[in-house]
Amino acid sequence: MKKPLRWLAALTVLLLPLSALAQQQGLTIDIVGGSASATPIAVIPMPYQGSGTAPQTDVSAVVGADLDRSGQFRTLPAAQIVEKPTRGTEVQFQTWRTLKQNYIVVGRVMNAGEGAYRVEYELFDVAKGERMLGLAMTARANAMRDVSHQMADAIYEKITGVRGAFWTRIAYVTASGKGGAMRYALMVADSDGYNPQTIVRSAEPLLSPNWSPDGKKLAYVSFERGNSSIYLQDIATGARELVSSFRGINGAPSFSPDGRRLALALSRSGNPEIYVMDLGSKQLTQLTNHFGIDTEPTWAPDGGSIYFTSDRGGRPQIYQVAASGGSANRVTFQGNYNATASVSFDGKKIAVAQGSGNTYRIAMMDRSLGSPSWSTLSPGSLDESPSFAPNASMVLYAAREGGRGVLYAVSSDARVRQRLVLADGDVREPAWGPYRTAH
């Protein structure tokens, strides 16, 4: 299969060969790139200071790993942590100045009773010797990783001014077996690959997962009925609804920012076009009508327009059309292949799969300063399906390595990349979920 057809693969099921894997395994992270210019921060081990059984989760390790993979921070290696304060009054700031640390995080874990734990932690500016943050959180043992991610989010936001996105989830598709024995699974996991959860299994391909804005549902494409169909599924209950099973292609679902509508690509009238479905009434509005192939819709953050991939100009490029329909405007002009757009929360950045020759990389168009500027985020050579983190600090994407599918997350400044892989298999179709809300 020629690579320029990959932008249509989700619709035509021209899938690359998939290798065997163990579906029950979670993703594991391997940091493959870093940045010497990242901000130094010491995350001190947080001991259990209570009676009874200590929690299995190493809170400080999770916090440190989160900060490291953001690309913005560089945690002090454990071997260089010469003192282990657990509260601010024990911090000798000169020690950490000598170690050239900008910030230090200290804390402790205590028994909160009835199977719960309390974590108290503080963040200090080392140069000033001042406390920047001091919080306490309580959770049951099975929620300690969630608490750790929330701590990392708070630290990240306090220092950078940008909301952290560690306490989020990702969706992806795995496959097992070969030939006619292939089995597929739509999975959801924490953003660091832990706590994988199977949403649906199928003997037929599963494609294009897309999160509802409240993070409670996934829209996806399934071929279990023979033809492509679009389902909505509740992640917590497993309840699902068939919303599109028209003749021909039913593909590339995308929730609107208010969660009330679904953009999708349909060929019910012959040619793949962009439609919007009202999820309450199931009424369809056709947005495009062109002899070219229009697919892969994704909403602008304000809900007023939709970006999509089209070859109407001869090669795949990104276009934009009003959510009510009308004429479409071309958005991308650099390169002769740009597809599968993901738009940042503020609408200023668009990540795409960009092709040049036989190499396909993840690139980003940034309009923050007005005129678009481009940067390359991945090395290639078969990279696709970019998906922004909700704070746009990182981009999740799919790649091929050694004949199998892997996922990478790269910081939006391309300073750090992390590989997320299954130990023995194939993983594709990534989608980064929205912010989560504590209950």
UniProtKB/Swiss-Prot annotation:
Signal peptide limits: 1-22
Lineage: superkingdom: Bacteria
Keyword annotations: Cell cycle, Cell division, Periplasm, Signal
Main location group: periplasm
SUPFAM superfamilies linked: TolB, N-terminal domain, Tricorn protease N-terminal domain
Biological process annotations from GO: cell division; protein import
GO cellular component, one term: periplasmic space
Family: Belongs to the TolB family.
Subunit details: The Tol-Pal system is composed of five core proteins: the inner membrane proteins TolA, TolQ and TolR, the periplasmic protein TolB and the outer membrane protein Pal. They form a network linking the inner and outer membranes and the peptidoglycan layer.
Descriptive protein name: Tol-Pal system protein TolB
Organism (species): Xanthomonas oryzae pv. oryzae (strain MAFF 311018)
Gene name of the record: tolB
